[in-house]
Amino acid sequence: MKLAYWMYAGPAHIGTLRIASSFKNVHAIMHAPLGDDYFNVMRSMLERERNFTPVTASIVDRNVLARGSQEKVVDNIVRKDREESPDLIVLTPTCTSSILQEDLQNFVERARQDAEGDVLLADVNHYRYNELQAADKTLYQIIKYYLDKAQRKGEIISEKTPKPSVNIIGITTLGFHNQHDRTELKRLMADLDIEVNEIIPEAASVDNLKNLPRAWFNLVPYREVGLMTAKYLESEFAMPYVDITPMGVVETARCIRKIQEVINPQGAAVDYEDFINEQTLHISQAAWFSRSIDCQNLTGKKAVVFGDNTHAAAMTKILAREMGIHVVLAGTYCKYDADWFREQVSEYCDEVLISDDNGAIGDAIARLEPAAIFGTQMERHVGKRLDIPCGVIAAPIHIQNFPLGYKPFLGYEGTNQIADLVYNSFTLGMEDHLLEIFGGHDTKEVITKGISADSDLNWNKEATAELQKIPGFVRGKVKRNTEKFARERSIGEITLEVMYAAKESVGA
């Protein structure tokens, strides 16, 4: 356990609550102390939800610590069952309930005797799983529970739909542009003449989960949530799955070709090559843009990419393959799936960083001095401090990345959105020169390119004036090299002589 200024992935119970509150008519009860119940406020604000978030906190207080939790938790489950009539109540453990070593499964068994709906314990280890792993496990658990139940009752319809059909797995509340991606994926499937059988968990009913085996295949657009479910459906019902994220022109085409490969042996006779060519050459603007003079201005510019596995890997490939941008570092905070990430990005970037320490990422950005960053909300803060533009491409995100307008990242419309984001994230050539000549609207002194600590060295007036004369795009590098030279020689104040000596020492 560590004290963190910033967490990229939240604790396990947040992942479980995201899944439970994505379903329709499912209620979650969280056994937690006051303070752990911020999920309701966060979801209502960020998703701009009109309905109340279906989560109740069963508060661990001094009475509970004195008398035990069973009575209170069971009463809360039965009361919510009576008041809300949900199809399912999910009891969510937290780190507190783990510390108290309470037998929550026993509480669930006890509550099932009095509740009309189903009651399920989210079986996630709070100290081993983070938000994303817990979301994946909880989704799998709910689907397995209902498919097992339907099998016992003989209600599963395993007969496939007449036309090719798909289950889209992993669209959740509080996901990065998930609601927009959902619409775009439905549109893409319609263009491919594929019916959408079920979308889970977002806005899905647990009563419809027994229909999942009717689909011809499963599509998992995000690696973080849904893969465990897809593997279970493959092993249990022989349902193939496609886990290629359709983000960017190349990967969208690869995803569509994989879908063709999966459905043709099942009786379809489709050839999507003409569709891919039409979309790539005429419908999507991204392929045309990547050959335009505007995009050629970006060729060779340096960028850093950081985020979850899905978005960071896809963005790295788009920048390197489709836009000719030099990715100096690609990173992810999904340490549990590091091998897959390395395999995906290693040929498209200079350096791979697997870390959930925001300080390490900030220092790497300061060291590399890219022209733009593509990351999470935290990298946006880092970019503001270093005066480097940042495009947000992955969660965690703030409210400006839950846009009211239509902004998918997947599919062919997603390629247009990404092209806009990339182009608008870089400071363009003429803008650079004008800022250099006129100083922009800002009269800041030298920007310190460091995150962990501010400079401990004193620059005298002449050296500072000389530093200001150096063009902005190399100023940070000159400043850093000079300070390194001074520290190595225990020089306390940087003068013009020190600057020139430092310049000679690096052979500039």
From Swiss-Prot:
GO terms for molecular function: 4 iron, 4 sulfur cluster binding; ATP binding; metal ion binding; oxidoreductase activity, acting on iron-sulfur proteins as donors; oxidoreductase activity, acting on the CH-CH group of donors, iron-sulfur protein as acceptor. It comes from the Bacteria. Substrate binds at residues 429-430. The keyword Iron-sulfur applies. The active site is at residue 294. CDD domains: Pchlide_reductase_B. Its EC number is 1.3.7.7. It catalyses: chlorophyllide a + oxidized 2[4Fe-4S]-[ferredoxin] + 2 ADP + 2 phosphate = protochlorophyllide a + reduced 2[4Fe-4S]-[ferredoxin] + 2 ATP + 2 H2O. The keyword 4Fe-4S applies. Binds 1 [4Fe-4S] cluster per heterodimer. The cluster is bound at the heterodimer interface by residues from both subunits. It holds the Pfam family Oxidored_nitro. Pathway: Porphyrin-containing compound metabolism; chlorophyll biosynthesis (light-independent). Signal peptide: none annotated. [4Fe-4S] cluster binds at residue 36. It is an enzyme of class 1 (oxidoreductase). Keywords: 4Fe-4S, ATP-binding, Chlorophyll biosynthesis, Iron, Iron-sulfur, Metal-binding, Nucleotide-binding, Oxidoreductase, Photosynthesis. GO terms for biological process: light-independent chlorophyll biosynthetic process; photosynthesis, dark reaction. InterPro entries: ChlB/BchB/BchZ, LI-POR_suB-like_C, Nase/OxRdtase_comp1, P-CP_red_C, Protochl_reductB, Protochlorophyllide_Rdtase. Belongs to the ChlB/BchB/BchZ family. Protochlorophyllide reductase is composed of three subunits; ChlL, ChlN and ChlB. Forms a heterotetramer of two ChlB and two ChlN subunits. Component of the dark-operative protochlorophyllide reductase (DPOR) that uses Mg-ATP and reduced ferredoxin to reduce ring D of protochlorophyllide (Pchlide) to form chlorophyllide a (Chlide). This reaction is light-independent. The NB-protein (ChlN-ChlB) is the catalytic component of the complex. This is Light-independent protochlorophyllide reductase subunit B. It comes from Microcystis aeruginosa (strain NIES-843 / IAM M-2473).
